């Protein structure tokens, strides 16, 4: 920099430090602890009974995977090339001190809808919280990205803290047959919840995730954890589970960034195909998957954690992009997830719903085609008509 001393470059930074409020200093200390532990990764016995019928259609070699379009022998990549470096991640966390909208400390949930043990006709979806949904179809109980912890963080004293309780206590769940884990970020792979869920289940559920995640899942008691590459599948009861491409990243610490595979799920059932996106940015993969597996009876699409766009666009949909994904997938109905529970990014707590309504209106789509639920509320689809106990959150 033309002979400019290195220390001189930090003067603007030091000036901003002097402006910090007591609350911002506390937040800075918290962020520092979490970043040191995670490496900026935010966003980063014998089974007692037989498993349900589970036959991998294609079985990867555990821990040894061939080089591919998204794996170079050491790390996984997005095929689009979208990625953010450590500098961008650090910049995002620093700017969080000044740019995050204020969220309420807590929001009470309305009374939950009654939980049924099994559903043999149609599809019943119960929103629990964040990306956790109980999907009941064809006699199977499916749980996505189970999270019941108070914080989504490597430590219990720092990191994003929930402002809404799960809509269903973990103890109140029916018997779970299949768990889908989209990737290993703390707000999607919650080891405390997974361990408790395993302990209370008489039979070991089938748990499916991307390459590299099985070892961690087995430590939580899922000895028969299945890990899949993009395009691979496994059979669970009357459902075929496909692990498919999405645009995101992985990592739980400083030394495992992009070492495990992230992805979305397609679950083909006699009642129709179901799509669970997990976490993803928008890319052509939605159109490809819509053509390959669609139409979808139900899609679970993230609508929150999307600001600022310069950082989040590659890895998180905003509501407008979620509506486009809904159309690309040829989804008859979509449920918005991943919002209003943990403050991960800058937008206000009610922005995802308002922006979703605006995006639907701009496309001339009724809210009945892409809706949201309160934690604990359920929707049931029979044939092509929806019988709803829910309402769009106002």
What are these language model-derived features?
Residues 35, 41-161, 166-172, 210-276, 355-377, 382-383, ...:
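Metallo-beta-lactamase
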Residues 41-42, 55, 62-63, 71-77, ...:
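Cap/insert and terminal regions of metallo-dependent hydrolase folds
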């Amino acid at each position: 920099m033309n002979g400019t001393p290195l220390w001189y470059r930090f003067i603007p930074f030091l000036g901003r430090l002097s402006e910090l409020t007591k609350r911002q200093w506390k937040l800075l200390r918290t962020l520092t602890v979490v970043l040191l532990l995670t490496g900026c990764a935010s966003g980063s016995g014998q089974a007692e009974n037989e498993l349900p019928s589970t036959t991998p259609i294609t079985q990867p070699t555990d821990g040894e995977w061939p080089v591919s379009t998204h794996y170079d022998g050491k790390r996984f990549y997005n095929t689009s090339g979208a990625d953010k470096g450590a500098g961008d991640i650090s910049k995002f966390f620093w700017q969080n001190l000044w740019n995050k909208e204020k969220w309420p400390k807590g929001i009470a949930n309305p009374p939950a809808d009654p939980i049924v043990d099994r559903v043999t006709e149609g599809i019943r979806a119960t929103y629990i919280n964040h990306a956790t949904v109980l999907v009941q179809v064809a006699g199977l109980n499916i749980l996505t990205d189970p999270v019941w912890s108070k914080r989504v963080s490597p430590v219990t004293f720092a990191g994003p803290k929930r402002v809404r309780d799960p809509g269903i206590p973990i103890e109140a769940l029916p018997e779970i047959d299949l768990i889908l884990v989209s990737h290993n970020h703390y707000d999607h792979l919650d080891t405390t919840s997974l361990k408790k869920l395993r302990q209370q289940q008489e039979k070991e559920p089938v748990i499916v995730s991307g390459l590299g995640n099985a070892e961690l899942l087995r430590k939580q008691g899922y000895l028969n954890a299945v890990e899949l590459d993009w395009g691979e599948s496994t059979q669970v009861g009357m459902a075929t589970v496909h692990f498919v491409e999405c645009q995101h990243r992985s990592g739980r610490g400083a030394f495992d960034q992009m070492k495990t595979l992230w992805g979305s799920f397609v679950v083909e059932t006699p009642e129709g195909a179901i799509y669970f996106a997990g976490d993803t940015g928008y890319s052509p993969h939605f159109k490809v998957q819509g053509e390959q597996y669609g139409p979808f009876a139900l899609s679970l699409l993230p609508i929150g954690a999307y600001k600022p766009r310069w950082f989040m666009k590659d890895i998180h949909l905003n509501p407008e992009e979620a509506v486009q994904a809904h159309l690309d997938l040829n989804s008859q109905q979509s449920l918005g997830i991943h919002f209003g529970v943990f403050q991960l990014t800058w937008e206000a707590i009610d922005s995802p719903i308002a922006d979703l309504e605006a995006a639907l209106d701009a496309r001339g789509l009724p809210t009945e085609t892409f809706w949201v639920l309160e934690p604990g509320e359920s929707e049931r689809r029979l044939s092509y008509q929806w019988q709803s106990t829910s309402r769009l959150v106002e």
